[in-house]
Design a protein with these regions (language model features):
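Non-heme Fe(II) oxygenase metal-center motifs and adjacent flexible, charged/small-residue loops
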Residues: 1-167
Length: 167
């Protein structure tokens, strides 16, 4: 796992405002409702047990701001996923599905009030059996074929993920 950047407070505010404007749908994974809401651009991968289906969604280029973030952090990405987790949300240890290429770029956004020092709570992210505390606005790149998880959240969170569908 590698930190690419930590967004400035102004950039975080702009991205949070953008997230609030997105229409999110409840995620269904292997036929079950999950703790997350989602929205896809480019290509969506839907999973049902050992099968995956890839669907076209609105083009990434249909949103100039989103397209600029893709070009900045993972220009080859053809699939972007926005997740919202509520307090208590979690995702167990897993490897991402084979329909994706290995590398993922993720922007972590914490939807909670800052403390007196202007800092928001961190998000625990477990990757490769090590715990990391992701800051609000932290941009990371990681290999999704290494076990990773998000333990039970203490604050709501957005996760904006850039990926490439494997050819």
């Amino acid at each position: 796992m590698k930190t690419l950047e930590i967004l400035s407070p102004v950039e975080c505010d702009r991205l949070m405002s953008w997230c609030y404007q997105q229409e999110l749908n409840h995620e269904i994974f292997t036929g079950q409702l999950t703790c997350r809401k989602q929205r896809w651009w480019g290509f969506e991968a839907e999973f049902y047990f050992n099968r995956s289906h890839v669907y076209e969604r609105p083009p990434i280029e249909s949103d100039a701001y989103l397209s600029s973030l893709r070009d900045r952090y993972q220009p080859e990405a053809n699939s972007i996923l926005l997740y919202r987790y509520e307090v208590g949300g979690t995702i167990g240890e897993h490897l991402d599905k084979q329909c994706f290429e290995e590398m993922v770029t993720l922007i972590n956004l914490v939807d909670d009030l800052p403390n007196l020092f202007g800092q928001r709570p961190t998000t625990r992210f477990r990757w490769g059996r090590q715990n990391y505390e992701l800051e609000h606005g932290q941009v990371i790149a990681f290999n999704s074929r290494v076990l990773h998880s998000v333990p039970k959240l203490k604050s709501p969170r957005y996760s904006l993920q850039f990926r490439r569908i494997a050819q």
